[in-house]
Amino acid sequence: VDLVLNNNFDGIDLDYEGFAFVDGNTTWTKTAPRWVALVKELSVALRSHNKLLSISTPYVYDPKEKQKGYFVYAWADVASSIDRLRIMTYDYSVAKPGPIGPISWTEKTLKYAVSIMSPSKVFIGLPGYGRDWITSVQGKCPVNAPPGLKGGAKAATFKTSYADTKAA
């Protein structure tokens, strides 16, 4: 709260991704109540100074669904304590080729979010990027490869993007 007040910020955005992506979901049942307590306590303190609290999180699905997404963020439990929910509707496919933020996935996430809080609180992060995935391996890197490339390593071929194809 001091950071917000001392810098005359409108509020603060909590973007805690470590417990979702680093700790793993085996810790989530213990982490979720602590997260909720933090959000609620910070909300009370910020609102006493007329300041905003937003949270940025990956997707969460309706708990009635078979897949729950990143349920550790407990949207339903923090909905009344936040002013904005910023949903990361990107990185659906990371390690394997696929869409970055498919519409059906984004819609499912948004439907749940607006079912538990005012739609005016819900914001989405849209992917403005693409990824290159290795699609085939041909040959080996030269022995005198530049720094950062291992000489003799397998050489990768990347799928050509639509923009590259159009420009050619």
What kind of region is each of these model predictions?
Residues H49, S118-P119, P127:
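Short glycine/proline-enriched coil/turn segments at helix->beta-strand junctions
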Residues D83, Y112-I116, K150-K154:
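Short, surface-exposed, polar/charged, turn-prone segments marking secondary-structure boundaries
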Residues G101-P119:
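Catalytic-core region of carbohydrate-active enzymes that cleave or remodel glycosidic bonds
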Residues G128-A168:
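Glycan-binding loop/region signatures in secreted carbohydrate-active enzymes
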